[in-house]
């Protein structure tokens, strides 16, 4: 069985309430349910982790290598400046795909740069919750099933 960890960063626990014109009305719990439902017929276990604390995200990334085949991460605001999360992502030997619900390139200037993208295989941005599904599909079709 393949194991994938989905990590969500700060304020994503506020989805459904926070800036619905940008992020929509869907909650993080609804997103997690949609992901699980989409992959219900796969030989796949998906775990979800959300934290507003940088250190907890770093710890989760570092310990993930022991248990997971890959990570899908939405670092949220940390993507724009967290060298510590970037370094944690670089320190592990499993693939990481970065996801953003909104199109960061259509947002404020300071949101258009993702430092964490440097340690990601790729970045999926602007497709809402479906970006997570796209990331997991990529992982399954191009990385995990090839082994």
Swiss-Prot record:
Q: What class of enzyme is it?
A: lyase
Q: Where is the active site?
A: 23, 100
Amino-acid biosynthesis listed as a keyword: yes
Show the catalytic activity.
3-dehydroquinate = 3-dehydroshikimate + H2O
> Record keywords: Amino-acid biosynthesis included?
yes
Free-text function comment from the UniProt entry: Catalyzes a trans-dehydration via an enolate intermediate.
Q: What assembly does the database describe for this protein? A: Homododecamer.
Its Enzyme Commission number(s) read 4.2.1.10
Q: Cite the CDD domains for this sequence.
A: DHQase_II
Protein name, entry field:
3-dehydroquinate dehydratase
Q: Which Pfam families match?
A: DHquinase_II
Site (Transition state stabilizer) location in chain: 18
- Biological processes, Gene Ontology terms: amino acid biosynthetic process; aromatic amino acid family biosynthetic process; chorismate biosynthetic process; quinate catabolic process
What Gene3D superfamilies does UniProt report for this protein, alphabetically? Dehydroquinase, class II (3.40.50.9100)
What's an example of a GO molecular-function annotation for this chain?
3-dehydroquinate dehydratase activity
Name the domain of life this protein comes from: Bacteria
Q: At which positions is substrate bound?
A: 74, 80, 87, 101-102, 111
UniProt organism field = Clostridium botulinum (strain Hall / ATCC 3502 / NCTC 13319 / Type A)
């Amino acid at each position: 069985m393949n194991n994938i960890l989905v990590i969500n960063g700060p304020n994503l626990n506020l989805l459904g309430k926070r800036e619905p014109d940008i992020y929509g009305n869907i909650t993080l719990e609804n997103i997690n349910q949609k992901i699980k439902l989409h992959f219900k017929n796969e030989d796949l276990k998906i775990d979800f982790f959300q934290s507003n604390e940088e250190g907890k995200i770093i710890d989760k990334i570092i310990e993930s290598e022991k248990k997971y085949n890959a990570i899908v991460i939405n670092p949220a605001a940390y993507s724009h400046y967290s060298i510590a999360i970037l370094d944690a992502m670089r320190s592990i030997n499993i693939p990481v795909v970065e996801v953003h619900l909104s199109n960061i390139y259509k947002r404020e200037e300071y949101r258009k740069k993702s430092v964490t993208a440097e340690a990601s295989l790729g970045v999926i941005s602007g497709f809402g919750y479906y970006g997570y599904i796209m990331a997991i599909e990529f992982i399954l079709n191009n990385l995990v099933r090839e082994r």
